């Protein structure tokens, strides 16, 4: 297991580090106001309806109020609560669901800032569609099922053009604040939020000006998506994985480094990955994002920068070995395509190269690697097909890595010496 460097631990508050590493919030005990330390967590005792640590006890069942309260280690949550990650502390909190948000008639209160409700400056092709959306939202304190149906129809019309290079840029530059608000609004049905995120994703794909606009004009958007991911994953909604995949797709389209995301993001991604273990497509999207973040933090062929990368990686994630295990397993999956094979292998390659013996490689991966070396060497020796230089380069890298990175470097040198004879 790769451990967090002591210098990093000293730079962070013990409360935040503990909440990040242990997947749960460490807060004041309601009755005594004392802080539960990380060591105390090892001695949690559950007795009846209480959880105790060194004679300090709190209820086993979380007792919600109308204001946000911290969720203590080991507590069980009643159904129907609002759950969030506190963006200032990184701690998980819950409160009673405000009855005014969802009425008996299935209406939804939509909280949209006045800034997002402002009409787009200047008319363009989709002004009328978004004007209709704003009128629906602005004229009703709550949204009925009919209102939601009309909003969905508007999204369907816009979706036809969102993938277009010019149209996508116009939509985002005029309407992104509203689209982002609708995508992240927890008071709306998932279907409507999913449509809004789909528009954003369609506009982002293969459209660098859109990527640049969002990245520069809305720098906090990525952190807000991570918080929404956490809340959505905790909701246990049967359709939440669809919206989770949309959120992950947006993050994968934007430039992301570890510094762009909250410190608890690696825990959120691990929880999403584990809870959706039957959804292989979703898990692939999580690993894509992990690969993207680690790659963005890395600078090749510079010892100083490699040291910095190692420090940043350990700071961002305390469980790099666990991610390495997932990459080893996923890269062996026969259902993934060559592009994902390259991406996940390269990530594992870099982790092993930098962290060396701190990253353990299992026998299953080594057996897979041996088989891949044989098959890819055969392809390299085959002169019957037109060469793909990018593919050839990766194949050679994989073959060399068997001994040079994942095995005995001396064996690599001996093999090369024999090949030259």
UniProtKB/Swiss-Prot annotation:
N-glycosylated. The gene is SIL1. The keyword Chloroplast does not apply. One of its GO terms (cellular component) is endoplasmic reticulum. Interacts with KAR2. This is Nucleotide exchange factor SIL1. Gene3D superfamilies: Leucine-rich Repeat Variant. Its main location: endoplasmic reticulum. Induction: By the unfolded protein response (UPR). Present with 2420 molecules/cell in log phase SD medium. The keyword Signal applies. It is found in: Endoplasmic reticulum lumen. Residues 1-19 form the signal peptide. Keywords: Endoplasmic reticulum, Glycoprotein, Protein transport, Signal, Translocation, Transport. It comes from Saccharomyces cerevisiae (strain ATCC 204508 / S288c) (Baker's yeast). Required for protein translocation and folding in the endoplasmic reticulum (ER). Functions as a nucleotide exchange factor for the ER lumenal chaperone KAR2. A motif (Prevents secretion from ER) lies at residues 418-421. Pfam families: SIL1. One of its GO terms (biological process) is SRP-dependent cotranslational protein targeting to membrane, translocation. Belongs to the SIL1 family. GO terms for molecular function: adenyl-nucleotide exchange factor activity. Glycans are attached at residues 105, 181, 215, 233, 315, 333.
């Amino acid at each position: 297991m790769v451990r967090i460097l002591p210098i990093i631990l000293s730079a962070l508050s013990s409360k935040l580090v503990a909440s990040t590493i242990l997947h749960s919030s460490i807060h004041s005990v309601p009755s005594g106001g004392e802080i539960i330390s990380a060591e105390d967590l090892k001695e949690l005792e559950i007795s009846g309806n209480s959880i105790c640590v060194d004679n300090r006890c709190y209820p086993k069942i979380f007792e919600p109020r109308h204001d946000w309260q911290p969720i203590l280690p080991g507590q069980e949550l009643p159904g129907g609560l609002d759950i969030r990650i506190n963006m200032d502390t990184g701690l998980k909190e819950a409160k009673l669901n405000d009855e005014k948000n969802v009425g008996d008639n299935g209406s939804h209160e939509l909280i949209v800032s006045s800034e997002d409700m402002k009409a787009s400056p200047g008319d363009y092709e989709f002004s009328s569609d978004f004007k209709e959306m704003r009128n629906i939202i602005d004229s009703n304190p709550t949204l009925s099922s009919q209102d939601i149906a009309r909003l969905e129809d508007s999204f369907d019309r816009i979706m036809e053009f969102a993938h277009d290079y010019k149209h996508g840029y116009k939509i985002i530059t005029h309407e992104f604040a509203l689209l982002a608000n609708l995508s992240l609004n927890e008071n709306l049905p998932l279907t409507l939020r999913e449509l809004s995120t789909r528009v954003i994703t369609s506009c982002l794909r293969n459209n660098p000006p859109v990527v640049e606009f969002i990245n520069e004009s809305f720098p906090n958007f990525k952190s807000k998506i991570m918080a929404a991911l956490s809340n959505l994953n905790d909701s246990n909604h049967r359709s939440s994985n669809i919206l989770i995949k949309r959120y992950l797709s947006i993050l994968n389209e934007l430039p992301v480094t570890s510094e762009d995301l909250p410190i608890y993001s690696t825990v959120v991604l691990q929880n999403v990955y584990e809870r959706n273990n039957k959804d292989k497509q979703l898990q692939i999207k999580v690993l894509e994002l992990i690969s993207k973040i680690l790659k963005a933090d890395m600078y090749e062929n510079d010892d100083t920068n490699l040291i910095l990368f190692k420090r940043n990686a350990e700071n961002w994630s305390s469980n790099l070995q666990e991610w390495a295990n997932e990459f080893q397993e996923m890269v062996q999956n026969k259902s993934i395509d060559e592009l994902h094979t390259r991406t996940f292998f390269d990530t594992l390659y870099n982790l092993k190269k930098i962290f060396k013996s701190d990253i353990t490689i299992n026998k299953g991966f080594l057996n897979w690697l041996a088989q891949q070396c044989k098959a890819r060497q055969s392809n390299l020796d085959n002169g019957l097909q037109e060469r793909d230089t990018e593919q050839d380069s990766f194949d050679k890298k994989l073959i060399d890595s068997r001994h040079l990175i994942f095995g005995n470097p001396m064996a690599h040198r001996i093999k090369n010496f024999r090949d030259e004879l």
